[in-house]
Design a protein with these regions (language model features):
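A short acidic, Gly/Pro-enriched loop at the edge of an enzyme's catalytic core
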Residues: 112-121
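Short alpha-helix
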Residues: 189, 200-223
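Class I SAM-dependent methyltransferase SAM/SAH-binding core
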Residues: 54-110
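Residues lining the SAM
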Residues: 123-125, 154
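A short glycine-rich, Lys/Arg-flanked "PGG" loop and its adjoining helix->strand segment in the class I
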Residues: 135-150
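Conserved class I S-adenosyl-L-methionine
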Residues: 1-51, 64, 68, 150-187
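Core SAM-dependent methyltransferase catalytic element
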Residues: 216-218, 243-265
Length: 265
């Protein structure tokens, strides 16, 4: 199967998720509209002050984080390949009277629709695992950064994607061995939603991610790994005193998230 077909399946999946995600407790749009940020303490502390800065948010879904950046004083642009998600993002920014910009595009094709450079490029929680080619991804990141601009990403650790979450047997390679096809029921935000869909993803090691960025002119400032998740998105998770999640059967033995900060040289 070619890349276009993979993206067609995944775009259909994400289009179908928009309505259930909008109404889910996970996204809690009601409290968001009332002023609550959708960003977590980890990324907020690592990104720092963004007031007055321009931010490009890649793979933004329906843009709650993007709008949160606008509320913090940034000039924020969100990009996603789901037309339905972008439509909802535009609806939210209109309702909330923020100046957030949204673009519907596959990030590999973004140069055809956007001719700007940004102080910050940001991506989070469900990013490179949806992309087959990290060299092209990192080139896009570098292209849209101003010289001296900052790239920041935070995501679920690739070690997690090796395991069968029920049996804890190793099911997939840590390294990119090609597209992984899965039949999914519901989603992380609405596990009881009735839709059944096919998705395609790719495992990428930390070294593959880091080297793709370095090879495209970015200097790594830090790589952090965390023994917790900001979200309850896997089975067998319990919440700790600080509101962070970890696997009940694994404790703090596995890295669940990582973050990277880099600067364009």
């Amino acid at each position: 199967m070619n890349e276009t077909k993979y993206f067609e399946y995944n775009r259909k999946l994400w289009d179908e998720r928009v309505e259930s995600h909008k109404n889910s407790k996970f996204y809690n749009v009601k409290d968001f509209k009332a002023g609550k940020t959708s960003l977590n303490a980890t990324e907020l502390s690592e990104i720092g002050d963004i007031n007055g800065k321009s931010i490009l948010h890649l793979q933004c879904h329906f843009g709650m984080d993007t709008i949160s950046f606008s509320r913090m004083g940034a000039k924020a642009t969100g990009v996603d390949f789901s037309d339905d998600a972008i439509d909802l993002g535009r609806e939210l920014t209109k309702d909330l009277k923020t100046d957030t910009c949204f673009i519907s595009a596959n990030i590999y094709d973004l140069k055809e629709q956007l001719d700007s450079r940004f102080d910050i490029v940001f991506t989070s929680y469900g990013t490179v695992g949806w992309l087959p080619d990290l060299t092209r991804w990192a080139e896009i990141v570098s292209h849209f950064l101003k010289d001296g601009g900052m790239f920041y990403m935070i995501d679920f650790h690739p070690v997690i994607w090796m395991y069968d979450n029920k049996s804890w047997d190793i099911k997939y390679s840590y390294f990119n061995s090609g597209a992984i096809r899965e039949e999914v029921h519901g989603s992380y935000a609405d596990r009881y939603h009735q839709n059944v869909a096919i998705e395609y993803g790719w495992n990428h090691s930390i070294s593959e991610i880091i080297n793709a960025l370095i090879n495209n002119g970015l200097q790594i400032k830090f790589l952090n790994e965390f023994p917790f998740s900001s979200y309850n998105v896997f089975q067998d998770m319990v919440q700790g005193k600080r509101g962070q999640w970890h696997f009940k059967s694994q404790g703090n033995n596995l890295p669940l998230m990582y973050s990277i900060k880099a600067v364009k040289r």
